Amino acid sequence: MKRVTLGGGKAVHYSTTPDGFMASPACGGNRASERYVPTDADVTCKRCAKILAAEAEREERLNRDPRGDEWMGRTIGDAVTVTLHGRTFDTELTGADHITPGWTVAYVDEDGQRNGTFVVVTDADIQDGDKVSDPRKDAFDKARALGMDWAEALDYANAKTAEMAQPTHVSSVESATHDNDDNKGTGTMATKKLKLKDVRGDVRIGAVPGADAIHALRNAVDENGRNLPMCRTRTKNPIQYWGPAAEQKPELELCAGCSKVVPTGEVSVSEESVEVPGLSMTVSQKSYTPVEGDDKGENMAAKNDTQDVDAQISAVHGHVDNIKTAETVEAVKEAAEAAEGIITTLPTKHRNTLRSTVKEARTARETELTPVTPEAEAAKAEVESRRSADVAEDFNDIEGVPDLIKDGVKLFSQGVDLGLKLTNAGEKLAHVMLTMRQKIVNPATGLPDLTAERKTTKNAAAEVYAQAKKRIADDDVERQGAHNSLVRATQNKASDVLVDWLRAFDGPDRKESLAVASELFGDKLDGLKDDASISEAIYRLYAGQGIELPRYGRTELARYDRRVKAIEGATKELETLTDGDKDANPKDVEALEEKIKELKAEVPEEILTEKLEPKAEKSDAEKTADALKVIRAQVDKAGKRFAKVKTANEKRKAKAELYSIIRAAADAFDLDLSALVTADEDE
């Protein structure tokens, strides 16, 4: 054991520096000093003494005989015959693998030699007939069959069995992954990056020197004595052990992988004296012991938090029920505000769905409670008269539409079930909606209603959503939210699907494209030249009827917007660089110019023209005309409101304010108010 000191009565340190390098203490010491020299004196640095104790503990663990450790009905050290990758060889069990689950064994090559490689095997790979049923493995397999991930399955298996073997030596083979040997029925599994203050205090913490990721370490090492993280990460350089989680900075974060499997919960702290092997001294060392709870050490605080969230969600639904039965609009408002007060305290993942539920209930109830005025009836009648040209026929009478609705409902329900695959399901649904539009003809144009101008087309699409929603229980908030998300995903994909479909007409099989066009548009495209674009002919056909079909999908436009913003940013940076007093670095200028050129090459010319070219500034006369239009609209609106004023006093106040506005307008516009008096009034 090497020891170093600065001399002059300074502390004696333990050193792990290889021969041929400048000596330095294991604890770090004075990093700025270069005067550490070897010594034979006893180590007096307490931090180095603790490191020595940890080294001794690791050596003891490495040298401990693994025989007697049992796992899944076998004993580590048993001789076995293994068939792996088409080869059969004799070896022995060297460790337990709690993830597969199985064992690690020493690999024997074709020459019968062992090269220090370890592999993971299962019962199916072992050729003896001594397999013994293991309840923990059965529980693990059952959990995996139920769809749990490996961490959840391990937690389930641990809860179903009373004890679990702890391997002392684990393979470092890249493909082998292992569970935390000390995560035995204690703690809850994390679902995001945890801060060290939330990790159970006895968990070993470490990191690769110079790296950012912080890992939770297993109570095991590989065959080279290197620390193993709880996550699947395999590092090129060894992970340095820092100490237990309780002694680290609480604001530091674990890596995402370790956060998923690291145990949490409380620990009890005690101090004990530990003798340093090889030295005539003892040091005080803290010991951390997990606190066992009523539910196998579960973090009860986290459990109570979950219960509180469930109770709060139930309270929100209670307010929704109050909204639906409220007798006044004011009561509806109060219940909605009470629900919002609870929603803001909930985790983000619950908020949107609950807010949507509250909003729908509030809108529906306020509509029911608001009396229909003559003005509203008149406005409604006017809207209906404008739509009289589009009388909605029964879409079920259109050939092929009912079957497409059934297909859409089936796909919609599948999309809600999948949840995480909303985008793909939405795109498939958008294709169904497009096919539906192709079959519904707009009588005003004689063309397929590709842009859903007709009420019939909109009703057919709405029927898909409505029938799919009937399959979801009213109180199933999560699935209701997934339903709404899929509706939005389908609508967002509509333009993408339509644009792709139009572009496909110019594909390599022109004969097939013409056949499809003839089926959809009849003889309207007859006479098209052999080299003419079919898609452009369709665009012109619809433009002639006053309908502009989209040339770019929503996804494309979003991508182009990002490119345009990048171009604007690079252009401003280039202007700043070249407009300064100092000479700009030619390489920087060239790099920015090249970047702008590459970005512009990725955006269509018409998009660049629309987004980047300066807009013509309106003249003062045009701005005045726009402002007067706004004033006229506001006057009309105020007049309708004024007609509902009942008391004479309130009417006088309104008129006085209007006279004041008129006088201000006369001053601003230099008006001659006498021009408002007609000839009849003069007489």
Swiss-Prot record:
Top-level division of the source organism's lineage: Viruses
Keyword Transcription among record annotations: yes
Gene name in the database record: C
GO MF annotation terms: DNA binding
Tagged with keyword Transcription: yes
Protein name: Repressor protein C
Species assigned in the record: Streptomyces phage phiC31
UniProt keywords, alphabetically: DNA-binding, Repressor, Transcription, Transcription regulation
